[in-house]
Regions:
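Conserved phosphate/anionic-ligand binding catalytic regions in large, soluble enzymes, centered on
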Residues: 14-32
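Short, non-ligating residues that shape and space the ligands of small metal-coordination modules
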Residues: 169-170, 190-191
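Cysteine-rich micro-motifs
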Residues: 174-187
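Short cysteine-rich clusters marking metal-coordination/redox-active sites
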Residues: 160-164, 181-184
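A structural-propensity feature for long, helix-poor, extended segments
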Residues: 48-79, 84-88
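Short, hydrophobic/aliphatic alpha-helical segments
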Residues: 1-14, 163
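Short Cys/His-rich Zn2+-coordinating modules
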Residues: 136-148, 162-167
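Short, flexible, mixed-charge glycine/proline-rich loop motifs
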Residues: 145-157, 170-175
């Protein structure tokens, strides 16, 4: 694993800037991997890990910098719960740990660095030096993944009988005997014009 400073450089390049959320995400991922005993996430351990993130904010961009998990590799999963939290799943040992940022860490950053007026700078400095137990709560959990959720899954591709678009990874819906994509089954996030 790299140093926090090295990860910060990589995170800033990936995200476009460095902020408190990035440092939080980096430390969260480092902690999660330490708990699981994964030492080389981009080396020998790269196929052992699936990570679930729970928010679409800065911390989520930092987590893959440490873990190597990517959406396109099917090793990064997004579940929108609006929480600065992530669950790190070791596929080799079937162990998983959920790590969540403590809300109290913001106040602790103010206590540690009262001389810094800029809140983001204050939190960045605080998150760099805080004890991991002051930054995060963690809980051992079980995450049950179907085979279609694993990296490398090569399931059958279906075709939506309504729009004709292809559907991968068992994401189809069957309604009245018809195979539909989720959009045509009514789960659109957009409205056709």
């Amino acid at each position: 694993m790299r140093t926090l400073a090295e990860y910060e450089e990589l995170a800033a390049a990936a995200h476009g800037h460095l902020c408190a959320g990035q440092i939080l995400g980096l430390r969260m991922a480092i902690f999660g991997l330490e708990l699981l005993g994964i030492q080389e996430p981009e080396g020998k351990d790269r196929k052992r890990l699936v990570t679930f993130v729970e928010i679409d904010r800065c911390a989520t961009d930092a987590i893959p910098v440490v873990t190597g998990c990517r959406l396109g590799k099917r090793a990064l999963k997004f579940r929108d719960f609006g929480k600065v939290a992530a669950t790190f799943c070791d596929l080799e040992t079937a162990r998983a740990v959920r790590v969540a940022a403590r809300e109290s860490s913001k106040a602790l950053a103010r206590e540690l660095f009262p001389e810094i007026c800029n809140r983001n700078e204050q939190q960045m400095q605080g998150y760099r030096v805080m004890r991991v137990e002051d930054l995060f709560a963690h809980q051992w959990v079980r995450v049950e993944l179907g085979p279609e959720e694993f990296p490398g899954y090569k399931g059958a591709r279906r075709v939506c009988e309504e729009c004709g678009e292809g559907i991968s990874f068992e994401r189809q819906v069957v309604e009245n005997g018809r195979t539909l994509c989720r959009h045509c089954a009514g789960a659109r996030y957009y409205t056709p014009l």
